[in-house]
Amino acid sequence: RYGYFLGCIDLTVENGQMIACQIEAIPTKDYILDLDKEDEAFIKAMREEGHRRLAQEKVANLGRKLNFNETCQLVLQAVCQETDSQLTLLNTGLIMKTLGPQVTMADLQEALPHQMRMARLFVTGQELKEICREVFTKAELLKNQAIKGMGFRGKTFGEVITGNFAYKNGNLLYNSRVVDSNEKFSLVLVDQYYFSSYFPTIKEKEVTLLFPDLLRELVAKYLRNNGAD
């Protein structure tokens, strides 16, 4: 699944019927050849050129270096505004570095390297409470777990963070008040929450996947519209 093995399947067929099947998983490290110096130099040059071009693409001047919590809050706010959603639910493992004072696309590539888009769903207060109960409970188990696949390019899941609402002691708070069970909200998440097996309550909902922007591209749009030049 992660490129560690090659799959080899040998089928024996007689008269249109399969009579034997042999399956083998072969470690890719047994087949990887050492790169020669010319290949290594080419790869390094392409990587550096890509970073140089992204670094030239100025996004915003925040005036100062943000700390980690401030960077998280910026991402939460950006996601809500750029997807026209009321609420958002993310995890700190998505944010790989802090931002500011100058922000370029190279900074956003490093801070939010994930190949993830956003998923939006409409929920009642009761449904949101069920989602939060599941996500916050699972997050305690996932907090320090290495996550791979589904576009995630970070290390661990981290902690759950919420945008425009709070989940405390089993209650939802929105605009400094307890949410009614029948209230309706638009909630936006990274698509990983929908595709993964961690959160079956989310997979059961009708979800709209938002194209074409990746997470970092939404943040770039927000900063261009709201950040100082």
Model-predicted regions and their roles:
Residues R1-Y2, T28, T92-L94, Q192:
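Residues that form or immediately flank small-molecule/cofactor binding pockets and catalytic motifs
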Residues L74, S85, L94-D229:
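Feature captures C-terminal
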